[in-house]
Amino acid sequence: CLKIFKPDAIVETGTHTGETTAYMAKESNLPIHTCEIDKRYYSYAKLRCQNFDNINFYNNSSDIMLEDLRAQLKDKRIFYYLDAHFFDDLPLKREIEIIHNSSESYFIMIDDFQVLDDAGYGYDNYGKKGVLNINYIEDLVGKYDLQLFYPAIKSEAETGYKRGSIIITSLCEVSRVTEIGTLRKVK
């Protein structure tokens, strides 16, 4: 995905233990901005990733970090990895709103998302707060004409963690995203 989208930076919400952060820092060498609201996870991830000089850590909520980065990242191609859905707050809709209102060109990946036509992929269900699926974000899809893509690979062919995901792009990025053979457009 990163090779085709060619972002200038990566923004991750929900650092947790820094596993994904370290992977992206090593594989991309791009500037990474990542936030973790929980002080313990934030401290652990900073320690774990201390050898990477391309990571900027924020001990904040995701919406605060995204707002703070708006001016700095304006007019840049950003890959957003949204994974800040763990505790009582489910900031996903606010995150998408901020991103859409900050840039014309964006590429968002949401982790732990239900792939509606493939039950083999795991996803997060927050009860009354919502299930991470298209129904949860459908009002934003219509409001902003968001373009949605699921993994093209069936869950039974996956290795490792079989967690669902979705890619969201702005309309201007659809042609670029369709070049990614591991994604398929959501109908």
Please give the residue ranges for each predicted region.
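SAM cofactor-binding core of SAM-dependent methyltransferases
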Residues: C1-L66
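Acidic active-site catalytic centers that drive phospho-/nucleotidyl reactions
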Residues: E12, E36, D83, D111-D112
